[in-house]
Amino acid sequence: CSVLSNNYWLMIFCINRYFSWYICTGRIETIYPMMKKDLEDWHAKYHKPVIVTEYGADTIAGMHKLPEVIFSEEYQVTYLEENNRAMDSCDFVAGEHIWAFADFMTSFGLRRIDGNKKGIFTRQRQPKAAAFAIRKRWLEK
């Protein structure tokens, strides 16, 4: 990309990543190594702080499965924990933003069961298990 060929004006680098969701779907064990390597590669290339501006997994509120499988609340919690672990291991990560705060309506599709369900809260603003995991994460910081 010619815009990035001279990174003089580039202050920070932002990426959206969905390892184990859109890439390697359902393979939770791929998140940490793939996210960590991706973050390190971008940082090595541009030598700038990185913000992960999107990461998330669709979850049907109330769906529980062990071992965790896609769309279960347990999967979303583990998904977020593995991404957080990768980001926390890189001191150049300047921020992160879960996609999304709450579920919202979108067009229908194979990956859109009654809207986007990547929220840590439902459309009615009721917490999913992930909301409690994220609360715990930030209270411990």
Name each model-derived stretch.
Residues 138-141:
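Surface beta-strand/loop "capping" patches
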Residues 1-134:
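Substrate-binding/catalytic cleft of secreted carbohydrate-active enzymes
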